Amino acid sequence: INKVEKLERGYRIYHGDSCYEGKECVISAGRSGSKWMEQVCRDLNIHTNSNRVDIGVRVELPAGIFSHLTDELYESKIVYRTSKYEDLVRTFCMNPKGEVVNENTNGIVTVNGHSYEDPAKQTNNTNFALLVAKHFSEPFKDSNGYGESIARLSNMLGGGVIVQRFGDLIRGRRSTPE
């Protein structure tokens, strides 16, 4: 989409050489389109106040460990409040018998999870995101930029996505390929 224009009774959307009009307009830009979406909102005088970002890791473990949950409810939502800072930690995007895949968004490599109905594509692992929401107060306004900078620094430190074994994490050391 090149431009979104507010009309007296609806919207006009410009996409390449085409133009579309409608009484209502729903735009879903996703995380990679968040900067563009912020600009669209500014152009249309739409107030935004997204001053939160989810920071986390993707956890992969043998499927049997969570099978008591995933056999009953495909995508379990687990929430935990930490005792020290009272942060809410939550699971998101659970993929029973799924795989972890790399994604490149604007030059930043992150991971996501997929799972498949086809048994031939299923793995022996389950994966999910473990997230903490970070809320910012004024005057800071660029929560998406904050999250992006953490991902970019992680890529710099690890030469790509950082992979960490749980045992090494507990011992306070980096995991090695061996």
Regions found by a protein language model. Give the residues of each.
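Residues forming the flavin
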Residues: 1-178
